[in-house]
Amino acid sequence: MDIQEQFEGYLREEVDLLNKFEDSHFKQLEVFYTNSQADHVINKDKAQFSDLPFHTTLYKEVNGKRVKLGTLLNWTKAERLDTIRHESMIKDERLRRLIDFDYSWIDYAVVLQRYLDEGNVIAPADILKFDSDFINNIKHPTEKNNFLDIKVIKECETYILMKDDNGIRDPDILRAWELDSIPDVIELDVDGEVKKFNLRKEMIKRIQDEAPVYFFASVSLCSRNLDPNISEVKLWLEYFIGSEDFFGFNGPNVVVSKSLLAAKRFEVVVNHLRKVAAFELDDESKEVMTEWLKYIMIDPVYRSYKNRGAFGNLNQHVFARTKSEGLSWSLIDIGTTNFELKPTKKLAGSYVKKFNLVDDVLVEESLKDLRNEGLYKMADITRRMIDADITPENVKKGKLNRLALSYCGYTGSHSATAMVKQFNGTKDLDPNCDPMFVDIVKDNMKVYMQEGLQKYPHGSRKINRLDILFKGGTSSASSTNEHATVNGRFRYRSELYRERDVNSSTVFKTATAGQYRVVKKISAKLKSKNANIITHPMNFINSKVSDLDVVVNAGSRLVRGTRAKRIITPNYGTIYAASLMTVLPAVRLLSSRASNMGALSTQGSLVDRAPHDVMAPQLAVTSSDDVSKVCVAKDFGQFDTSQWGQISKAHADGVRSMKVHYSMGHDALVDLDLNDASFADLLEVTAMSFEKPLKYKMNGLVCESAGVKSGELTTQTRNTTTNISHSTVALDDYNNRAYRLNLPKLELVTDNKVGDDSVEVLRVVDGSPLTPEIAKLYVSCMQDHADRNHLEISAKRTIVGNNVAEHIKIWVFKGYLALDVFLDSVTSEKNSFSNLNYLEQVNILYDMAMTLMIRYCSVQACMTQFCNDMKLLNGIRAGNYTFIPTPKIICAYGTPEICLRAPEIRSFGRYLPIDKDEYSVLNDLVASLSTNKPKMEFVSQMIEQNGNKVHSLWLDHFKRKNDVNPNGGGIHISEGLKRLMPEYCEKHLNELVYKTLDDKVIRDYTSDIIISNICKGKLSKAPKLAFYANFYLSLTNTNGVDSPYLTADEGVKNVHRVIGLSYRNTLSTSPTSNVDRILRNNPGSAPAYLTGNDILGVLSDYPYQNWRTVVELLDITEPSATAIIEVATNQMHAYLADKDLNTANLFDNTSRTYDISDRTYPKFVNITSSLSNSNRRGFQIEAMKHVIYMARRGVAVLANTHPTKIGNTVYYDY
């Protein structure tokens, strides 16, 4: 069989897989919702919603063929479900109490009753009782007791949980205590006065704040896949049923019956089953994870938290003493920003002994800690991995402790306590710092400011400042006290209700039978930063000296890995605006990385690059025979808040040093107007915001935060400055000490510092091998200089060596890399998943699968989980109806458009040999699911009821600046162009403001429109494919390298072998991002409300010869005008593909590692020469999708657009 026939055969198999997926999907729905009772052909049968049965299958008929659209559920007929899940079937008293507690468990109760009827028993488990010593940890800081001498507290109306000799360990971590064992009310002595404290109520409140459970699907559906015969499920059932440790939901909030963490136990067992399956763990690894599951089930969050230290101590040493060979990467150019992974051959028998510093005492202590907890299997397997051979299975074994910490999903700690601990940081240490270190911090900040302002001087020019403010600069938070409000009533008509739904407030009858008017009251504040800038610009423009004393609302976020809650500290509006003008250039400087420079030049990090780019130097060092090269990774703790006092003053002075270059400044802070202020005065505002501790409030607590603020614009820049300075003094100190001790010197070759994360490559200057003496001395120097400057660093967690390295949770060993396991989670940090529309939910599940595939999972495991998860999605609900689309939409235009065996190749579904009519219907179905008309109708009604919210300052600022006649130009002015022209921009600006509202009624109305239109046969028309061509394949030569992604899917590694590894993702930047960059770098040359998406959208409606006129009508001037036209000329193909699909960009977490670039196109693609450059690039990408598909199977092919002879067959493109 020739290669073309093989390829076509593979695609036919893909269609068969899709059909099987669809069949299994609908069979699962029959399990959930009983068998379908009727078929409804939307373009033939009339839709009388009230007449439809509970479970209907929807079709569209085309050319005599029926195409399945999905399942429609009519909840007014839901009594049909009761015949299979009637309460009378539940005999076990515990199960009856379960459904009394929360009736949504009825389906699972039926499953469990059958299990019990078969003679099985569910025994009770022992639930943890309240520890009365905890009461001693409850503290009440007050002004009278000097806030317990905690200096950061300025006001307090709440309690905190602090260490006490008579208390419990880590009181701020929520325990799984039995509710009835927690005292309802206790008496506490507060400043000599006895006060009553509602302890049980406070503990229950903590559940939602510290251990919420937001599943991606309803818990009742998730539980249906929990077979009670599985041993791990039996363990959970001993709590859930045996001890009646029930949980349910009141809206998004967890409600419990018996213990505080009943829902977390459920999440733990679900996560365990998913991860064991997805990671395809071997029997030994399964035993380790089952041991862990049994251990943490007793007290999930705390038992995870208490082992974090031991796990971290051991995790860094995986493969540290391995003797196995790895890959071999060249060290050529490692000292420049052009360094790229390139393989090099090792000489036969050239094995050299490498070295990594391992603290054996710490290892043994950590192993002992694990064994003391009963985690013998975890301890043994982790210890073995220090010396183990490097294999895919051993990499997984080495990461089992990380996997274990992911079981609890998102958790946090007591909010007020977290705030005190985080703000206090290292305040108890000596406030004095090493003067040399402080000077280096200042000098580094000065250099970043100087080079940043030279490259991006726009904020120093008054004419640009409003444009910079409007753009907002970054996603960093800001806080103000004034916000616009929106009040009104949103109205729409619906046929998805019935008579008994009518009430006096939201659902009303109309004169038309079967139609109802839905009215929802709207009352909201426009709190988004972008909306606030448009509605209240004076909150950002008029700066007062007292603004640095304003108490700002702090935020918080939960994290995975059972760590303490993170407190977010944004800047006040005027301080944020000053930062945009002054230090944003330095932020951008450190976010870019120019080519053809020395690796140690002032530059950015590689944090946003593919992992093999980020870690390229470390991959080369750990694989090289040059044992004089050394990788060093530091581990800072509390880094933000440890930079108080003299360090923050050094940051401030580095900013202040720029004042000498600008006139009319004052020596101290003054009230100012952003538009007229001297740039020197703006620099002083920024400097003082660094130097002066700022106040934040949250949950009845006001605290003062010194050091780096975790939500400010310059968090990463300031952290990077201090990080580099610490490395500088530590290296200088090492070389001074080494000289005295007769040890060789070290020199820095390259580094990558991202905030508090740091990885360096050093070289032993005389070329001798790294030795334990060198490593220990360098670690000692790093520790000493942290101690001298009230920084917190763990010497025992510092990695030094040339066998293994780590940076930003990417581990490197002998030329291979492993990524983190904190990916797949059935829950999210906030209740955000349920607020997404159906296609967005599918995309998140898909992205999760793609991330797993490049890390630890096979395509089979990833897509099995993806398909199973899709079956659990709730579908689209409106009124009394739910529509669940066919899962085959994943291959349709407007979704990831994938095939199941090569899912990372987005928009490849168009090449599957699916029936033409069926594919057209699926595309139209996706277009119907993607409608944004309801959102725009909501915005329109709110504008009509609330009027203009755009501040007059902006309407005046955006008046046309060029002298172009808006009615001239000789071209037809489309509605899309008109709305973006300065003369008509008020409506557009108001839409930007109102669109920031995300009210539930918008989702309800959108769902209503989708269901109504689909059932009535009013499918939207899908856009035409931007690019499609028949390609003919022939064999060619491979061009790639052995993959460093050792545990990735085998097909992914085949692509690396056939095509190669990407380099800096040069083609992954979207056209809209490129236009946005032009606008950002040239403020004032275009109205600031324009985006790359706006401009390219309008240009795509016009022929090329009209583009200059369109740009002028948009009031875009030079230098942006020509640059934008150039981007549009070269990249309109990519925009057209991205515009309709939204997910069509080829680059995701997996495919961005593939070398799809100008250097691989000539080797794998042969495009007809008559195409324009723009179209040529579009078809080159389409052709590469075919090449990647075959490369996954280890076959290198050339994709041709013209007829070619393959074997005995000649293929023609008709």
UniProtKB/Swiss-Prot annotation:
InterPro entries according to UniProt: RNA-dir_pol_reovirus, Seadorna_RNAP
Transmembrane segments: none
Signal peptide (residue range): none
Keywords linked to the UniProt accession: Hydrolase, Nucleotide-binding, Nucleotidyltransferase, RNA-directed RNA polymerase, Transferase, Viral RNA replication, Virion
Keyword Transport annotated: no
Superkingdom field: Viruses
Primary location class: virion
Any one of the GO BP annotations: viral genome replication
Compartment list: Virion
Keyword Cell wall biogenesis/degradation carried by entry: no
Domain RdRp catalytic as annotated: residue spans: 610-805
Substrates-to-products reaction catalysed: RNA(n) + a ribonucleoside 5'-triphosphate = RNA(n+1) + diphosphate
EC number: 2.7.7.48
GO CC field: virion component
GO molecular function: hydrolase activity; nucleotide binding; RNA binding; RNA-directed RNA polymerase activity
Similarity remark: Belongs to the reoviridae RNA-directed RNA polymerase family.
Its biological purpose: RNA-directed RNA polymerase that is involved in transcription and genome replication. Following infection, it catalyzes the synthesis of fully conservative plus strands. After core assembly, which consists in recruitment of one capped plus-strand for each genomic segments and polymerase complexes, the polymerase switches mode and catalyzes the synthesis of complementary minus-strands.
Name of the featured protein: RNA-directed RNA polymerase VP1
